[in-house]
Amino acid sequence: MLSGILIAALLMTLWGGWQPDIAHASDEFDALRIKWATLLTGGPALDPADSDIAARTDKLAQDANDYWEDMDLSSSRTYIWYALRGNGTSDNVNAVYERLRTMALAATTVGSSLYGNADLKEDILDALDWLYVNSYNSTRSRSAYNWWHWQLGIPMSLNDIAVLLYDDISAARMATYMDTIDYFTPSIGLTGANRAWQAIVVGVRAVIVKDAVKLAAARNGLSGTGIFPYATGGDGFYADGSFVQHTTFAYTGGYGSSVLETTANLMYLLSGSTWSVSDPNQSNVWQWIYEAYRPLLYKGAMMDMVRGREISRSYAQDHAVGHGIVASIVRLAQFAPAPHAAAFKQIAKRVIQEDTFSSFYGDVSTDTIRLAKAIVDDPSIAPAAAPNLYKQYAAMDRAVLQRPGFALGLALYSTRISSYESINSENGRGWYTGAGATYLYNQDLAQYSEDYWPTVDAYRIPGTTVASGTPIASGTGTSSWTGGVSLAGQYGASGMDLSYGAYNLSARKSWFMFDDEIVALGSGISSTAGIPIETVVDNRKLNGAGDNAWTANGAALSTGLGVAQTLTGVNWVHLAGNTADGSDIGYYFPGGATLQTKREARTGTWKQINNRPATPSTAVTRNYETMWIDHGTNPSGASYGYVLLPNKTSAQVGAYAADPAIEIVVNTSGVQSVKEKTLGLVGANFWTDTTQTADLITSNKKASVMTREIADERLEASVSDPTQANNGTIAIELARSAEGYSADPGITVTQLAPTIKFTVNVNGAKGKSFHASFQLGEDTSGPVDPGEPELPSVIVDNADSAGVTRTGTWKTASTQTDRYGANYLHDDNAGKGTKSVTFTPNLPIAGSYEVYLMWPAHFNREDAVQVDVGHASGTTRTAVDQRSGGGVWHSIGTYEFLAGSGGSVTIRNDALGSPDGYVVADAVKFVAVG
């Protein structure tokens, strides 16, 4: 307890010199404060007749009323709420301020039944006074129990309350509250999400007290570690779209979403003011949406594999979090440069409309509802196309495949990234959520919502290989071989060298992601722990009755709960989904398998996985079908292989099993490889630094490689060092002949025939995929001069010192990896019809040349980019669609050219597509033909 003398001193501080509110002259700070208040409440123009806004304000008023009724308002009180007694416990004090913030919102939001309620406001202010004396003042330690509450959580709530009730708070009272915040959070010096929270605390307080120096410091804080600049280690956003917090945890949908929200709000607040952000690195924020969030959002849900310990929070399930991220995208759309604002609106509209499970408007603020409805109701805004991609997040050991109708997330760990986070009594059963876990999303949008995490068997997470019934400790792994390769942003291969030291369990695990199938391989599975080892094929939440139909090899299986089965000679399985269509799953087992299955009702509580005070302890029950492969006790060199076939009917799965599109090339502890015959794809993971071959691919080092052969004319290849530890090169040989090529910097082609040979310099590449494209055909010229493409094939890159002429202002960018060379040019989606880039080759001989273009693709590109080819007979105009096909050469025809520099290719930014988009100029290739 505080001494009587100290209490008196604090009261004198609070009330000394008390005076009624002073009418200050309106200035820019007042405008910013009102802008922040509008962000919180929707402002005076909020339409209470709108049904979604009314539902939100009704809920707000109900929550506030419930809190108000439960308050202890007595003069002798020793707490504000009995349930949150314990005034020195930081989480309780933080929760008290959060409740008072809710009450302040109800008192100041148009349409709330408590709007303008003077008694409510007075009780809030009395509670703040009591808290100042008893809980939150400058005599407190800044870090007792949990520093986050004192320095970030409580100040954010108190700032908002001060803005909302600004006209009801005396100058003396306000100074006391603001001085306390300044005591706990005087400056900005942390990283990642914590830095963003510091910036918003300092910034909003600066607006309230009209401190220009502190407001500038808040703005400048965004330019620090873990926010605007891309991280190269530790916390923050990475150039590949990864987000890491606490040094080793993948957190795009957890701390990353907080960085996004807080940064978007502070940038919005300052936009158009004296303190608006001018740091050029703010452009990275726009890329967060494209690279970090668009691939990881599925129909309103944020993928759980990047939410860390937050998956154990009952109030923050995947759709609620996804809606919060979309709310931040809506906020960014209010002030981002026009092309990005337009793209953000399209993305937001698509996600809001396609989430048929949970209403977006039920999870966001009244102001966000107002802004989002303006987007959704605008017929001139077309929803963005659904993602169709494969993306490797090398910096956080994650990968994602998105296809129309389904998505698959893959969560791995390594010496760089930890398996799971469990601190502050949260995520107590997260053991295998990042240990080779697969997350399959389809039209069953409730799969990972509605109490999945407290009820799923946490020892059997899909995709994992485990010692049966045993947990693993949180931490980084013992092997650096985790990662994969992306080919053309559409296909990929990933792998993990698994080792659980506690159980002497090791395995090599790979996943090959093609168009509508995911192939999972395991090899070298060994253990001496005396515990059964198993690989979990799936653990799917079923419908409410638990009676989803399922078949094995076409024969119906029991749908009774509590039934466990051993199925032998299984070639394929089909499991009916929880929706009328779009949620069935097929499983194909090449060569057959013995499958263990269990259908059961599972009961659990959120409290069992999150032991925080406010976590509900009510039991919930859900039904599951679990399938796994039993490798036996103390296996040595065991293996497995299966194929996931999302959204296929039973008949389609049976037909696939009879004539599979995939072929397992090899599955050993040295190399794992799969061929997709219909697409011409071969993927291979090489596990050792010895020369090994898989199909057409030979590698001399640890590597992940994927190739695609297109119509016997072109061979695309991508290579990465998933270990991120090779400080030299990888030598690749492909059993094909070529007559020309293009390649990323870092690739040196040494031979085109009778086989293709090249090396990849992966020193410092940090898991990046390197791309090369080969024009197939016979070559008789012998070895290629390293570093120079074989003539007569000439490439002109935008970065070349000669042969490139710009008209108008073009910006240089390097964000996208499906580019040629170090960077590319874009027109900033401005000055349409006034800009061009002309590529002029110096051709060694006269004759016919086939002309190719390469560009980094993006959905915000122009779909009809005008291209003029200047040749010996005149000029020919053609058009290309830059929204897709990035990172590969596209032929635009064959033309006659004179020797020398008389020919050219001009890329124009005429606005002829619909809708208008960015135009990029990257590279042009001229290949002589016979």
UniProtKB/Swiss-Prot annotation:
Annotated Ca(2+) binding sites: 515-517, 676
Regulation: Activated by Co(2+) at 1 mM. Completely inhibited by Hg(2+) but not affected by other divalent cations. Intensely inhibited by NaCl and KCl at 150 mM, in particular by the Na(+) and K(+) ions but not the Cl(-) ions. Partially inhibited by iodoacetamide and N-ethylmaleimide at 1 mM but not by dithiothreitol, reduced glutathione or 2-mercaptoethanol.
Signal peptide residue numbers: 1-25
Subcellular locations according to the entry: Secreted
Protein's UniProt keywords contain Secreted: yes
Annotated effect of mutating residue 194 to A: Loss of activity by 60%
GO CC entries: extracellular region
Swiss-Prot/TrEMBL keywords: Calcium, Lyase, Metal-binding, Secreted, Signal
Result, substituting residue 246 to A: Loss of activity by 60%
Pfam family, one: Golvesin_C
Major localization class: secreted
Comment on activity versus temperature: Optimum temperature is 50 degrees Celsius. Stable at 4 degrees Celsius at pH 6.5 - 9. 60% loss of activity when incubated at 45 degrees Celsius and pH 7.0 for 10 minutes.
Coiled-coil spans in chain: none
Positions with a binding annotation for xanthan: 146-148, 246, 255, 309, 313-315, 424, 612
The protein's assembly and partners: Monomer.
Name the UniProt record assigns to this protein: Xanthan lyase
